Curated annotation (Swiss-Prot):
Positions of transmembrane segments: 35-55, 79-101, 114-134, 180-200, 226-246, 290-310, 326-346, 350-370
Signal sequence annotation: none
Keyword Magnesium annotated: no
Encoding gene, per UniProt annotation: mt:Cyt-b
GO biological process: mitochondrial electron transport, ubiquinol to cytochrome c
Known function: Component of the ubiquinol-cytochrome c reductase complex (complex III or cytochrome b-c1 complex) that is part of the mitochondrial respiratory chain. The b-c1 complex mediates electron transfer from ubiquinol to cytochrome c. Contributes to the generation of a proton gradient across the mitochondrial membrane that is then used for ATP synthesis.
CDD domains: cytochrome_b_C, Cytochrome_b_N
GO molecular function: metal ion binding; ubiquinol-cytochrome-c reductase activity
Name of the protein: Cytochrome b
Organism whose genome encodes this protein: Paraspadella gotoi
One Gene Ontology cellular component: mitochondrial inner membrane
Lineage: Eukaryota, Metazoa, Spiralia, Gnathifera, Chaetognatha
Keyword tags: Electron transport, Heme, Iron, Membrane, Metal-binding, Mitochondrion, Mitochondrion inner membrane, Respiratory chain, Transmembrane, Transmembrane helix, Transport, Ubiquinone
Binding positions for heme b b566 per the UniProt entry: H99, H198
Cofactor requirement: heme b
Note accompanying the cofactor annotation: Binds 2 heme b groups non-covalently.
């Protein structure tokens, strides 16, 4: 009798086998499908480095900035742990935006449960990143927390009380920092749980492919074809994170955040981390507080609408020439909003942000009708 393989002996090994070894995968995956596994890698790095940082961090408004300096100067290898954690967040968002962009371009949003879970994860990750940005308690951390939390006051009737509840007082202070640290420690584990659900939904429906067609009869096992490809991606990701952390450690940071928080001195220009800038530019482009908050929320929540606007012959934009160019115009608008969000609130940056914000939302309004128009002429 043939000996049973180890990966079939227990239910746990069977789950791992179904995810990493015998998973049926389309044979025409491109490198754009590597970003999902890279997100898992960087999330693991963030969890490990974050736990080590939490061992030495003090969530007290008088000590937090000094505790970060202590980690950099006095803790064994603390400097590299802190730099990898800070720069790893940037690489996580690079992979995340590429992953979302790939899903939008190739029509992966038609796997509705997987897409909705992914968008929820995106919002949760942005919340975790904002909470983490506040923890060093530098100038930009303090004033960024003040500005962003104040946005909740735009909610009618309950906004003011909600802000005071978040602050734990009448201004951003020690209670706020303690709450943000607690949530920042918790949320990544919720993200990990959500990622498992995301993978579960993905493997229930099967992966999309560049052509956006059903290819159940033309699949190959994940290992060794795509596992080797992922390992190559892991190597490059490790290389870039280490390269930035060793040679350009503060390239993606904000200089004002190396100054201890001072409630009596407002920075000349309050800027969040670069991965929030596109939403921040949309917020600033609307000359009304409530309108700006709604614009910021819609910039994220509009991703939920994509499965509702699709009723076409093909999933992938690669098969629609007009939609293909329209998608790249959307990418340009995203990049220009990111650049505009880092500029002072003055002309011509405000006007440019308004134009690019309109183009950003126009994509979601017209992408469905454009494909219907092209289907008519096919």
């Amino acid at each position: 009798m043939m000996k049973e393989r180890m990966r079939f002996k227990s239910n746990l090994f069977k789950i791992v086998n179904g995810v990493l070894i015998d998973l049926p995968s389309p044979r025409n995956f491109t490198f754009w499908w590597n970003f999902g596994s890279l997100l898992g890698l960087v999330l693991s790095i963030q969890l490990v480095t974050g736990i080590f940082l939490a061992m030495h961090y003090s969530c007290d408004s008088l000590l937090s900035f000094e505790s970060v300096c202590h980690i950099l100067r006095d803790v064994n290898e603390g400097w590299i742990i802190r730099l990898v954690h800070a720069n790893g967040a940037s690489f996580f968002f690079i992979c995340l935006y590429c992953h979302i962009g790939r899903g939008m371009y190739f029509g992966s949003y038609m796997q509705t449960k997987t897409w909705i879970m992914g968008v929820l994860l995106f919002i949760l990750v942005m919340a975790a990143a904002f909470l983490g940005y506040v923890l060093p308690w530098g100038q930009m951390s303090f004033w960024g927390a003040t500005v962003i939390t104040n946005l909740f006051s735009a909610i009618p009737y309950i906004g003011g009380d909600l802000v005071y509840w978040m602050w734990g007082g009448f201004s951003v202070g020690n209670s706020t920092l303690t709450r943000f640290f607690s949530l920042h420690f918790l949320v990544p584990f919720l993200v990990s749980l959500g990622a498992m659900l995301h993978i579960f939904f993905l493997h229930t429906t099967g992966s999309n492919n560049p052509l956006g067609v059903v290819a159940d009869s033309d699949k190959i096992p994940f290992h060794i074809y795509y596992s080797a490809k992922d390992l190559l991606g892991f190597f490059f990701m490790f290389f870039f994170i280490i390269f930035i952390s060793f040679l350009y450690p503060n390239l993606l940071g904000e200089p004002d955040n190396f100054i201890p928080a001072n409630p009596l001195l407002t920075p000349h220009h309050i800027v969040p981390e670069w991965y929030f800038l596109f939403a921040y530019a949309i917020l600033r482009s609307i000359p009304n507080k409530l309108g700006g908050v709604l614009g910021l929320l819609c910039a994220l929540l509009v991703l939920f609408s994509l499965p509702l606007t699709h009723s076409n012959f093909f999933k992938s934009n690669a098969l629609y020439i007009i939609s293909r160019y329209f998608f790249w115009l959307f990418i340009v608008s995203f990049l220009m909003l990111t650049i505009g969000g880092g500029q002072p609130v003055c002309e011509p940056y405000v006007m440019c942000s308004q134009v690019w914000s309109c183009l950003y939302f126009t994509y979601f309004i017209l992408c469905g009708p454009l494909r219907i128009f092209q289907d008519y002429y096919l």
